[in-house]
C-alpha cells in the first residue's frame, strides 16, 4: 500500500443508496414488477455516469437536511464505490433483461444477488465491488490505480484514522 | 393481494431470514474469537461486566452517537461496569484478533470475561442497557 491521496467520501450517502436499492428490489420481487427492477438499474446507470450514488439525491435532499441520517465522512477512494455501483448496474440490467425475456429464475436470481451484495455493504461494511476493483488493480489494469486506504482490508469500510 | 404476491412475499421473507441467519452465525463466530482473545485485554478476570469498544479518532458516528451512549451508560452504572476503549488505528493487531471489521464495534463481556454480545455499528444506549442487564 503506497502513499496516495484519499478523498472525503460520505458513507451515509452510499448506505442510503444501498438501502433504497435493497428495498426497491425486494418490492419488485414481491409485486413481480420487472419494470421496478429496470428502474433501479436505470438509476444505478445514471449514478455511474454522473459518478454519484444513483439514489444519493434522497440522502442529499431529504435525509441529511432533516437530520434523519448523519454524515459519515471517511478518508477513502470514491473510484471503487463507483465501480461497485457500475457492477451493480450491469447485474441489474442483465437481471431486468432476463425478466423481460422470460428467464425469471435467472432474472430474479441476479436481482437477489444485487440485494445480497448491497446488504453486505450496508450492514456488514464490506463492499464486494470495491474488493474486485482493488483485486483488478493488482493486475495493473488501466483505470484501476487506487489502493485500499492504509490498514484497511480491500473492500472493507475504512476504520479511519487513515492517513493519505 | 393475490396468492402469487403472498407466495412471493413469504419467499422474500424466507430469503431475508436466511440472510439474517448467516449474519447471526457470523456474529457467533466473532463472539468465539472474542472469547479466545479475552486475555489479550486482561491478565485476570474483570469480575464485572465489560464493554470493549473499538473506535478510531476520525469515526464520526463514534463521536456523535456511540461515545455519548457509553458515557451515559457509565454514568448510570458507575463502578458496576468497565468500559475499555481501543483505538483500532493504533491497535490494528487487537482489531484483527477480535475480528473487528468496522467501527464502532462493541463487545459485551460478562463478569467471567465471556463475550456475550457483539454490536457491529452503532449501539444505542437503550440497546446497551438491555444487553448489560442480562449479563
Each language-model region and where it sits:
Chain B
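Short active-site neighborhood of thiol/selenol oxidoreductases, capturing the structured segment around
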Residues: 45-57
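The canonical Cys-X-X-Cys-His
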Residues: 59-62, 106
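Structural micro-motif
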Residues: 99-107
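Non-catalytic, surface beta->alpha helical segment in thiol-disulfide oxidoreductase systems
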Residues: 109-135
Amino acid at each position: 500500500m503506497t502513499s496516495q491521496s484519499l478523498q472525503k467520501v460520505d458513507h451515509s450517502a452510499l448506505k442510503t443508496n444501498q438501502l433504497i436499492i435493497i428495498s426497491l428490489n425486494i418490492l419488485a420481487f414481491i409485486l413481480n414488477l420487472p419494470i421496478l427492477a429496470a428502474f433501479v438499474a436505470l438509476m444505478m446507470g445514471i449514478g455511474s455516469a454522473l459518478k454519484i450514488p444513483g439514489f444519493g439525491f434522497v440522502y442529499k435532499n431529504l435525509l441529511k437536511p432533516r437530520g434523519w441520517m448523519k454524515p459519515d465522512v471517511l478518508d477513502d477512494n470514491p473510484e471503487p464505490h463507483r465501480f461497485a455501483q457500475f457492477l451493480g448496474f450491469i447485474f441489474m440490467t442483465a437481471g431486468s433483461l432476463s425478466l423481460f425475456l422470460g428467464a425469471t429464475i435467472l432474472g430474479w436470481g441476479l436481482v437477489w444477488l444485487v440485494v445480497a451484495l448491497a446488504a453486505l455493504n450496508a450492514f456488514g461494511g464490506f463492499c464486494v465491488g470495491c474488493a474486485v476493483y482493488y483485486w483488478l488493480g493488482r493486475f495493473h489494469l488501466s483505470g484501476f490505480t487506487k489502493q485500499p486506504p492504509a490498514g484497511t482490508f480491500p473492500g472493507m469500510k475504512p476504520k479511519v484514522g487513515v492517513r493519505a | 393481494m393475490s396468492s402469487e404476491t403472498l407466495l412471493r412475499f413469504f419467499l422474500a421473507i424466507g430469503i431475508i431470514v436466511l440472510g439474517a441467519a448467516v449474519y447471526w452465525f457470523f456474529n457467533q463466530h466473532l463472539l468465539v474469537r472474542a472469547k479466545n482473545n479475552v486475555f489479550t485485554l486482561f491478565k485476570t478476570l474483570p469480575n464485572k461486566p465489560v464493554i470493549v469498544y473499538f473506535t478510531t479518532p476520525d469515526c464520526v458516528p463514534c463521536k456523535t452517537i456511540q461515545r455519548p451512549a457509553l458515557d451515559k451508560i457509565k454514568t448510570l452504572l458507575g463502578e458496576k461496569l468497565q468500559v475499555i476503549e481501543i483505538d483500532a488505528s493504533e491497535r490494528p493487531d487487537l482489531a484483527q484478533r477480535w475480528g473487528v471489521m468496522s467501527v464502532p464495534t462493541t463487545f459485551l463481556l460478562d463478569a467471567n470475561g465471556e463475550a456475550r454480545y457483539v454490536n457491529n455499528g452503532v449501539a444505542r444506549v437503550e440497546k446497551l442497557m438491555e444487553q448489560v442487564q442480562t449479563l
